[in-house]
């Protein structure tokens, strides 16, 4: 088995999907989890205005709507959380995503004060954060806020991780990568677009250039620039297609060096890191 085949198997990717079937699969997955653990009353998700959180948010609200109708349990809710750092450049996209999702509840937590306070506390301990590490600080502060909200609403935190993100480890460890449940896991980037198109999402929300937008020195840096490969390259690779050798090498290098991000903390029983 080639490394490409191993990766595809590990991430559960498929070369082709039926958008309606995958929508139903994700919604039923969320519903089943909530029904298995009836003490869970809310799904909590940060909404950025990008493709992934827009899709995950819509699926969450669909699952909650169906469960409320089927069970009569009005205590169930989906909480969309806006988590800007100061003023967000694409704020209108965030509002458009909220309008599309129609969440039960919308909360806004501006993380800038908390990030600056943390940075100052570290500075007083003689630790000066680089711009890149400050970006990770933002991602972790966003997740901390979501877990606080989940803790106070008997909820779980929903993630937006998908195959095209997981393969490159393009997430912050214990930031956006630290979640309870990931309904998009298995899908690549273009497949996520297919689901949003089937859900009649405004096109500009999934046709925009994806960006984590964490670095102050490089605002709105496109993911594809940071990664050195395009999402079309990554999606082709995940669909088992032939890609240029240098592209495959770049993707596989990302996969191998970020393996620790896809695993629980390393213990004496692990040996993957020795290979």
Swiss-Prot record:
GO MF term list: ATP binding; glutaminase activity; metal ion binding; NAD+ synthase (glutamine-hydrolyzing) activity; NAD+ synthase activity
Pathway: Cofactor biosynthesis; NAD(+) biosynthesis; NAD(+) from deamido-NAD(+) (ammonia route): step 1/1
One cellular-component annotation, GO: cytoplasm
Coiled coil: none
Superkingdom field: Bacteria
Binding site for Mg(2+): 52, 165
Alphabetized Gene3D superfamilies for the sequence: HUPs
Residues bound to deamido-NAD(+): 140, 173, 180, 260-261
The entry's keywords: ATP-binding, Ligase, Magnesium, Metal-binding, NAD, Nucleotide-binding
Short name of one Pfam family: NAD_synthase
Enzyme class name: ligase
Family listed: Belongs to the NAD synthetase family.
NCBIfam families tied to this protein: nadE (TIGR00552), PRK00768.1 (NF001979)
Protein name (record): NH(3)-dependent NAD(+) synthetase
Source species: Shigella boydii serotype 18 (strain CDC 3083-94 / BS512)
Taxonomic lineage of the native organism: Bacteria, Pseudomonadati, Pseudomonadota, Gammaproteobacteria, Enterobacterales
